[in-house]
Amino acid sequence: MASSHSLLFSSSFLSKPSSFTSSLRRFVYLPTRQFWPRQRHGFSTVFAVATEPAISSSGPKKAEPSTVVLPSNESSDKLLKIRHTCAHVMAMAVQKLFPDAKVTIGPWIDNGFYYDFDMEPLTDKDLKRIKKEMDRIISRNLPLLREEVSREEAKKRIMAINEPYKMEILDGIKEEPITVYHIGNEWWDLCAGPHVETTGKINKKAVELESVAGAYWRGDEKRQMLQRIYGTAWESEEQLKAYLHFKEEAKRRDHRRIGQDLDLFSIQDEAGGGLVFWHPKGAIVRNIIEESWKKMHVEHGYDLIYTPHVAKADLWKISGHLDFYRENMYDQMEIEDELYQLRPMNCPYHILLYQRKRQSYRDLPIRVAELGTVYRYELSGSLHGLFRVRGFTQDDAHIFCLEDQIKDEIRGVLDLTEEILSRFGFNKYEVNLSTRPEKSVGGDDIWEKATCALRDALDDKGWSYEVDEGGGAFYGPKIDLKIEDALGRKWQCSTIQVDFNLPQRFDITYVDTNSDKKRPIMIHRAVLGSLERFFGVLIEHYAGDFPLWLSPVQVRVLPVTDNQLEFCKEVSKKLRACGVRAELCHGERLPKLIRNAETQKIPLMAVVGPKEVETGTVTVRSRFGGELGTIPVDDLINKINIAVETRTAL
C-alpha cells in the first residue's frame, strides 16, 4: 500500500483542469454526420470512435468505418501508468533541453497528462523539440526505478539540484519514507507512482504534446506563473488517431466559435470578462428556453417569483455565505451606512418569502421557482465562454415540505427534470446519489429518512445510479444528474439537494396539527443549472444546427432576382405575423444566398422566382430534407406550426 504522502503526487490529489474533452463518454461516429451516444447501466467509462472522417451523403457510398474502443484511466491501469510515466519523460526532456527549467508537479489527467515548469514561455517549435527528445528517451527503454529515502536524504538531493518547488512539496509531506522514481540513472522525481517498468513500454507514436498554458503555482494568483504543457497518450497509434478525430469534432462544435459565427452571444472586453451579452438571435433561443421552463413549472405546481440581485451583508451572514463562501463573492458596497453585496445564490431570498407570513402544515408543500441571476467571483484564467462566467442565471427552485412529503417531492422533481431535458434533446443521464459525510448537521433519523426518500424516488423512476457514500454536503444528501450530449460527453446540470441547515439558520417554521411550531424540510433544486451553461451545451450538442422549433431564424426568404423583392417582403411579413421567425435576405445571386443560409444554419429557405410570384407560392428548401416542393405560403405556415408543436423537422 502506498504511503499517505503519495496523494501529493498522484493525479487524484490534484484538481483536474476543465476542458471540452474532460468528460468523454462512449459514442459511435457514423458516416451520416450524426453522433449517437451509447450507454450501458447508466454510464460508461470507455467510448468508441471511428477512425475515418464523415463523407457527404451525395458522394460515393463507403462502408461504415470501424470503431476503436478508447479506454479511460479508470478502466485501464496500463493506460494510467503510461500517462503518468509520460509526464515524467516529458519533464526529463524539458530539463535536458532547458537546463534552467524548474519542475513542479506532473499528474495524469482524463485524456493524458501535464507538467508545470517554472521557465520562459514556450512556443510550438519548442513543443516539437520536446517531443523529439521524449521519443529518444522512450526508444532507449530506460527502467523506471522506485526508491525509498529518508526526509533528510530527500532534502539533501533536492538542494543539490536546486529545485525549490520540490522542496515545498517535500515540506508538506508528513510521513516517511519518501518515495522517489528514477528514469535510468539520469533523472528523478518525488513520486509514489504508479509507472510502467521501462520507457520502452510507451508507444511513442501514441503520444502527442497538445498545448501550453499558464498556471499559477498551487493555483494561487499571487504565486509564480508557470508553463503548463499538456499532452495526450494512448496505448496504440490507432487510439491516438481516434482521440484526435474526436477532438477535432469537439472543436468544430465549440460554442464560442459557433456563438460568434451565428451571432448568438459575445463577451465584451469593455464590460469585463465572464459577463455575457445575449445578441438578438441568442436572446430568441433563451426566451424559448425560459418560456418552456416557466410553463412546465407552473404545470408542476410551482409559483414563479422574482427577487433582488443585491441584499444587505447581514443576510449573507445569517445564511453562512460570509463565513464559508466569501472568496466567491464580490466586495461589499456601502449605501447610507449599511453594507450590501451582490448575491452569489438565490436561496436566502426564497426563505425570506417563505417567512413573510405564518405557514401551516396545510400550506405545505410550497414550491417557488425563479430564473435568478447571481454573481460569483472568478479569476480571469478560469473563465471559459458560457461554461464559466461571473454573472449567470440559475433555474433555481426551492421546496418547503413535511418530512413525509420528501419522497413524493423528489419524485416530482425527477419527473419535471426528465420532461424539461427531453424537450431539448437530452435523454441519457448519469445519476449519482451522495450520502451523509462524516461531518454534518441534522440527526440520524432525518438523514436516514431523507436519504431513503431520494433512493426510493430514483428506484421508483427506474433510473440507474451510483451511490457516492459520504459524498453529500454537510447539510443534506443530494442527487446529481449529468446529461450526455451528441458526442457522449457528460455535463453537470441538474442537482436536487435536501437541506437541514438553512431552515435552522433562518429559524423557519410551520404550525402542525397541534399548533406547535415545527421545522420544515427544504429542498434546493436546479434542472438546467444555469441558462448560460445550458445554452453552451445546447450549441455544442446540436453543433449550432438547432431543430426548427428552437432555431432563432426558422425561414429565410430568398428572391431569385430583385424583381421578386416586393413579394418576398409580403411573404416575410405574413410569416412573422403568424409567429414564424422569418427574415428576408437579398442583394446577391441565388446560389450565394443559399450558401449563406446554409452557413448560418437556417432550417428552411423559401425561394421566390417569377412563377412563385404569379401563383402566390414559395419553393421550400430544407437544410436537412432537400427540396420540399412549391407550396402556398399558408401551407408553409401550417407545416411549420405543426412541426414546432410536435418538435419535428420538415
UniProtKB/Swiss-Prot annotation:
Q: Does the keyword Secreted apply?
A: no
InterPro entries membership? aa-tRNA-synt_IIb, aa-tRNA-synth_II, aa-tRNA-synth_II/BPL/LPL, Anticodon-bd, Anticodon-bd_dom_sf, Thr-tRNA-ligase_IIa, Thr/Ala-tRNA-synth_IIc_edit, ThrRS_anticodon
Q: What is this protein called?
A: Threonine--tRNA ligase, chloroplastic/mitochondrial 2
- Provide the taxonomic classification: Eukaryota, Viridiplantae, Streptophyta, Embryophyta, Tracheophyta
Per UniProt, Zn(2+) binds at 347, 398, 524
Catalyses:
tRNA(Thr) + L-threonine + ATP = L-threonyl-tRNA(Thr) + AMP + diphosphate + H(+)
- Tell me where it resides: Plastid, Chloroplast; Mitochondrion
Pfam families per UniProt? HGTP_anticodon, tRNA-synt_2b, tRNA_SAD
Q: What happens when the gene is disrupted?
A: Embryo defective. Developmental arrest of the embryo at the globular stage.
Q: Does the keyword section mention Chaperone?
A: no
Q: Which domain of life is it from?
A: Eukaryota
Q: Which GO terms describe its biological process?
A: embryo development ending in seed dormancy; threonyl-tRNA aminoacylation
Q: What class of enzyme is it?
A: ligase
Q: Which organism is it from?
A: Arabidopsis thaliana
Which PROSITE patterns does the entry link to?
A: AA_TRNA_LIGASE_II (PS50862)
Q: Which GO terms describe its cellular component?
A: chloroplast; chloroplast stroma; mitochondrion
